[in-house]
A protein has these predicted regions:
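Bulky hydrophobic segments
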Residues: 2-173, 178, 192-216
């Protein structure tokens, strides 16, 4: 009898675990699907043309709007981060077990690149963030400052990273580690530096091209 109960407990555990891992990804997809449904209904899309209208609207905006393309790339990369860090993660029974770990390249004598990955992960994110929302974050002036650019990127990434770590802690989806928060934030700061350097280079090229045109 005890063996049968153990088997049923194991089956129930595996089933619940299999359902829990993709739970938040399923919630997000369901939310987006219902948003599309409401949008289509408000615009009078018919059911038999719903998919075609959806892709036609998306493609039209993608071709005509640079802001839409930038925001799409940011949303895509953000989804990739969430899938790696929160969505579809295994359950950790002790999310605070390694709160002060993960600083070096070796853990228990085993080489690991987790710290480097956490650093690199948010460099493209902060670049895409500033690229998509430069006016909203840095103002509408023709030139942007180095300090403000790096500070805004660092602050947004720090808050976003903390929300990820807190979600992992709250729902036992990974471990809460101060090192993750630190390396993610540093990556965001470096992304801000790279964006500023790219912005300055682009601005200098524009000024140079204007000078060449005025000479002719």
């Amino acid at each position: 009898m005890g063996k049968i109960i153990e088997i049923f407990n194991r089956i129930a555990y595996n089933v619940l675990l299999a359902l829990y891992q993709p739970f938040w990804a399923a919630v997000l997809l369901a939310f987006l699907a219902m948003f599309l449904y409401l949008y289509g209904r408000e615009h009078g899309w018919k059911k038999n043309n719903f998919i075609r209208n959806m892709f036609a609207t998306w493609w039209s905006s993608f071709k005509s709007s640079s802001n839409f393309r930038r925001t799409f790339l940011l949303a895509f990369y953000t989804a990739m981060i969430l899938l790696r860090t929160v969505l579809n993660r295994e359950i950790w029974f002790d999310p605070l077990g390694k709160i002060f770990g993960g600083w070096g390249l070796y853990e228990d004598g085993v080489f690991t690149t987790e710290s480097i990955e956490n650093f690199i992960l948010f460099i493209p994110f902060s670049i895409l963030l500033l690229w998509a929302f430069q006016q909203e974050l840095l103002g509408e002036s023709k030139s942007i400052g180095f300090g403000k650019t790096v500070w805004k990127a660092t602050k947004v990434v720090a808050v976003f990273s903390f929300m990820i770590e807190f979600t992992q802690l709250l729902f036992h989806l990974g471990t809460f580690q101060i090192s993750d928060l630190t390396y993610n934030t540093l990556g965001g700061a470096i992304g801000g530096v790279i964006y500023y350097l790219g912005y300055c280079r682009k601005r200098k090229n524009k000024i140079r091209n204007r000078g060449q045109l005025s000479e002719h």
